[in-house]
Each structure stands twice: as structure tokens, then as C-alpha cells.
Amino acid sequence: MHLSLLKAKIHRATVTHSELNYEGSIAIDGLLLEATGIREFEQVHIWDVTNGARFSTYAIRAEQGSGIISLNGGAARHVQVGDLIIVAAFASMSEDQAKTFKPNLVYVDAHNAISHTNHSIPTQAA
């Protein structure tokens, strides 16, 4: 059996651009792609924390160090500049691989610069 596990996420990134007339995708600062291990053209899920929208698209590289998070094409209809989003990628793996797998979790500040990284999410308490 194969499981689909969270491979990587960019947590609470701020949308900097929304380009309806650009080819569909999400342009992500190259530093964030490298930190997460998300590859260009890889499918990603977008969860808009601000308005609750959830959809998928593919990642393309934006200028390294630019802080750009740009939703393009049809995806631009789901967000507004200034919205907070989570970008997530998943990987399929065997149960044995899943036992030792650790996701790349990248947390960003208000300018989409990396504030810290982790490989686990703290246990949620009441």
C-alpha cells in the first residue's frame, strides 16, 4: 500500500501578486522552493487562510530572494493580494518509507522571507 504524506509546506505566505492573464501557476520565490524541495512544475495545493479557498496548481520559480508569491491564470480568481496562504506538496511512499520520512516545513514572515524551518508539527493541545 502507498500513502500520500505531506512532503513540504510554506506556512502563511503573503500573496504579493495576482496575475489573471498569465499562464496558470503559482510563482514562488526560488529560495522558498529550495528550502522546501518543491520542484518547478510540481503540483501544489493552495489553502487560502484569509478566505478559505482550496485549490491546486503547479509551482514555477520566481526570482530568488524576491519574496514573490504570485497566483496566476485561473488561480488568481481565488485569492487577493495580501491574503495569507499555505502552499503544500505531497509525496506517495510505502508504509516503510513513511516510518522515517520527515517533511520540509518552511515558515515565513510578512515579507515571505524564511523565519524558521522544521520537520515536524508540534502536538496540538486543548
UniProtKB/Swiss-Prot annotation:
An individual GO BP term: alanine biosynthetic process
SUPFAM superfamilies for the chain: ADC-like
Principal localisation: cytoplasm
Sequence positions that bind substrate: T57, G73, G74, A75
Cofactor: pyruvate
Pathway: Cofactor biosynthesis; (R)-pantothenate biosynthesis; beta-alanine from L-aspartate: step 1/1
Cofactor binding remark: Binds 1 pyruvoyl group covalently per subunit.
Enzyme class: lyase
Assembly and interaction partners: Heterooctamer of four alpha and four beta subunits.
Primary role: Catalyzes the pyruvoyl-dependent decarboxylation of aspartate to produce beta-alanine.
Annotated protein name in UniProt: Aspartate 1-decarboxylase
